[in-house]
Amino acid sequence: MSLLSAHLEQISISCQGIDSLPFPPPKIFTNALLSNPDITSLIRDTEAHERALFSVPPPPPRQTTLTAEQQQQQKPSNRRQTVFNVTGGEIRTGGVGSASTARRNTAVAAVLGGDLHAQIMRGTRARPGQQPGSGDIDMEVLLRGVEKLCAVYPLPGALERVPVIRQKWQAQSNTLAYYEAKIAEQQEMLDRIAQERMMNDGDGDVEMEDVEEVGMTEEDLRREEEEVRELDKRKRDLQARLRALDADLGGLLNV
C-alpha cells in the first residue's frame, strides 16, 4: 500500500501543477471546432444550391478485388491526400487520383446522390476503343438526374423539356425496335432466298418450269433489297436523333 500511496501522491501533485498553469479562456470558435455541426446550420437562410456546395457525396463502394491492370495504375498514386466531409465530419485519405476525383463535380454529385451519380458516370464512360463520352447512357437515369439538379439549381425551361424529351425518347425507342425487328426479318428472308438460289444453281437438271414455280422473282428480290436499304436508312436517322437527344441532356447536366 505504501508504494501505491506514493504513486497517488505523485499524481495528485501533477494534477495540482496542471491546474496552476495559466490557460486562456474559451474563445468564440472553440465550441464550433470541438463539435461537429452542419456548416450550413450555422448560417441563416441558406438556399438549396448553397447547401449543396458545402456537402460531399458519400464515397463509392470499395472494390474487393482489383485486376492486375488496376493495381498497376494505382501504384504511382501513393501520395497521401486528405478530403474533408463538411456535413458528415469525415476525413478520408487516398491517392492523388482519388482526391482529384472527389473534388470534381462535388456539388453536382451531392445533389444527385451516390447511387444516381455512379449510374450516370458508368453510362458516360467509354468502352475500350470508343470515343470519350460515347458509352451506353440510360436516358431515364439522365432525366431523373436533370430533374434533381433543376430542383436545386433552377434552369428556366429545363423542367418543361424533360417530359417532352422522355416522351420523344420512348416513341423513338419503340420505332427503332420495330425497324430493327423488320430489318432482321427481311435479312432472314434474303438469306433464305440466296440459299435457295445457290441450291438451284448447283442442280443442273432443274428445268425452266421449276424456276417459274419459285415464289420470289428477280423483281421481288430487288424490291426486298430496296426495302431493307430504306429501313436501314430510317434506322440510322433514328439513331442520329437519339444521339442528338443525348447531347441535349448532356448539355443540361453540364449547366
UniProtKB/Swiss-Prot annotation:
Record has Plastid as a keyword: no
Pfam families linked to this entry: DASH_Spc34
Record GO biological process: attachment of mitotic spindle microtubules to kinetochore; attachment of spindle microtubules to kinetochore; cell division; mitotic sister chromatid biorientation; protein transport along microtubule to mitotic spindle pole body
InterPro entries assigned to the protein according to its UniProt record, in alphabetical order: Spc34
Annotated localization: Nucleus; Cytoplasm, Cytoskeleton, Spindle; Chromosome, Centromere, Kinetochore
Keyword Ribonucleoprotein in record: no
Coiled coil: 176-248
Compositionally biased residues, Polar residues: 63-81
GO cellular component terms attached to this protein's record: cytoplasm; DASH complex; kinetochore; mitotic spindle; spindle microtubule
Record key words, sorted: Cell cycle, Cell division, Centromere, Chromosome, Chromosome partition, Coiled coil, Cytoplasm, Cytoskeleton, Kinetochore, Microtubule, Mitosis, Nucleus
Region (Disordered): 53-81
Main location, first listed in the record: nucleus
Subunit structure: Component of the DASH complex consisting of ASK1, DAD1, DAD2, DAD3, DAD4, DAM1, DUO1, HSK3, SPC19 and SPC34, with a stoichiometry of one copy of each subunit per complex. Multiple DASH complexes oligomerize to form a ring that encircles spindle microtubules and organizes the rod-like NDC80 complexes of the outer kinetochore of the outer kinetochore. DASH complex oligomerization strengthens microtubule attachments. On cytoplasmic microtubules, DASH complexes appear to form patches instead of rings.
Function: Component of the DASH complex that connects microtubules with kinetochores and couples microtubule depolymerisation to chromosome movement; it is involved in retrieving kinetochores to the spindle poles before their re-orientation on the spindle in early mitosis and allows microtubule depolymerization to pull chromosomes apart and resist detachment during anaphase.
Similarity comment text for this entry: Belongs to the DASH complex SPC34 family.
Record's protein name: DASH complex subunit SPC34
Originating species: Chaetomium thermophilum (strain DSM 1495 / CBS 144.50 / IMI 039719)
